[in-house]
Design a protein with these regions (language model features):
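Intrinsically disordered, low-complexity cationic segments
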Residues: 6, 14, 22-23
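Surface-exposed, charge/polar-rich loops and edge strands
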Residues: 20-363
Length: 363
């Protein structure tokens, strides 16, 4: 307990030093810009999930490894936390009664017969516009709130998604989704449907790697955060000013809370697999402390943020000027992250959802 208290005290001191040294001005998305070559953007998954590269970042030093090495970076009593959300086939295509095409990107279920969505369309749409999905299903636009539309369906929404929906690949993957994506744009531990984007840091894990980790005495916990469509959207001015992002539903149960406390009691690290897990854990701490919770979060983690729980994270490489590159910069330092991204580009790493990964250890 004394060692852990000293550790926490040092971490708090380091946080304030970071604030004083690097984050004494308000940062803008443009401060996180880096040119990612088109050829560095992964367009499809590797044959083997765990054959991706792993950039190990610790105390500012960079080591090139493979993801299959991840067990070597973990210690007994560490707690590895996964996001068990499951990606829905959330992309639909329909047409207006006039014949104009409409692309529908599902965001969140409201009830069995209605949902929130983002739309792309030719011409105009308005309240009452009907969108024909197939001979059995017609959607009707009920209302609009900024970029989101409330849609009423004449069939159960989940049935329509599963029968007609496509895997919602990110816009930087310049191809149509195929049958392989149904499997590979999903973690092997996905359980709870609700996401419209994969928690991509988890895509690298295989059953064999998880078994190796368990045999080492490392605990594996799970939470749920349903990734929303806002994860692909550019940051808006009001988000920067309010320091709030799009809302996403998350839940943490008693079992995970018990695992967190047990790991901390044994001086283990809390290791988040992905930015979604970071957002869920730090939201829990802000709202409850280490207590079960089911809620929505709009937390916007930027440089200067005081991480209360997460000690290390596994994450993919993120879009420049995005909320996610700002989050990892808050964790490791902006210059350190930009340096590691430049190293990754120079050394042939693959970027974004189907790309390679990082293990960021604060030491």
């Amino acid at each position: 307990f004394v060692m852990y208290s000293v550790y926490k005290t040092n971490r708090l001191f380091n946080h304030f030093m970071n604030v004083l040294i690097e984050y004494n001005t308000t940062m803008q998305p443009s401060d996180f810009n880096i040119d990612i070559p088109t050829e560095s953007i992964a367009q499809k998954p590797l044959k083997d999930r765990s054959s991706s590269k792993l950039l190990h970042l610790k105390d500012g030093s960079i080591n090139d490894q493979n993801f299959s090495d991840i067990p070597k970076l973990l210690d007994k009593h560490d707690l590895l936390i996964l996001n068990n959300t499951k990606v829905l086939p959330a992309r639909l295509f329909g047409k207006k009664e006039s014949g104009g095409k409409v692309e529908i990107f599902f965001e969140r279920l409201l009830n069995e017969m209605s949902f929130l969505a983002q739309l792309k369309f030719s011409g105009k749409v308005h309240i009452g516009t009907k969108i024909i999905i197939n001979k059995d299903t017609v959607f009707t636009i009920e209302k609009r709130d900024k970029q989101f539309f409330t849609i009423i369906s004449d069939s159960q929404v989940m049935d329509v998604l599963h029968s007609s929906g496509l895997t919602p690949l990110p816009p930087y993957i310049k191809r149509s989704p195929n049958s392989e994506d149904r499997d590979r744009y999903q973690t092997i531990f996905a359980k709870k449907e609700g996401a419209v984007a994969a928690p991509t840091a988890g895509l690298h894990f295989t059953t064999d790697i998880l078994d190796q980790i368990r045999k080492m005495g490392v605990s594996i916990g799970e939470l749920t955060l349903h990734v929303g469509a806002g994860t692909f959207a550019p940051l808006r001015l009001e988000q920067i000013e309010s320091k709030k992002l799009h809302e996403e539903y998350f839940e943490v149960d008693q079992k995970l809370c018990d695992q967190i406390e047990a790991s901390q009691a044994n001086n283990g690290r809390i290791i988040a697999v992905g930015t979604t897990v970071v957002r869920a854990l730090e939201s829990m701490m802000q709202k409850n402390g280490i207590e079960p919770i089911s809620d929505k979060t709009d937390i916007f983690i930027t440089p200067g943020f005081n991480f209360e729980l997460v000690d290390a994270m596994i994450t993919n490489f993120h879009l420049p000027e995005s909320s996610l590159i700002m989050l990892v910069s808050a964790f490791a330092g902006r210059e350190t992250i930009l340096k590691s991204y430049r190293h990754a580009i120079d050394n042939g790493y693959r970027f974004y959802s189907y790309g390679d990964s990082m293990f960021i250890d604060k030491g």
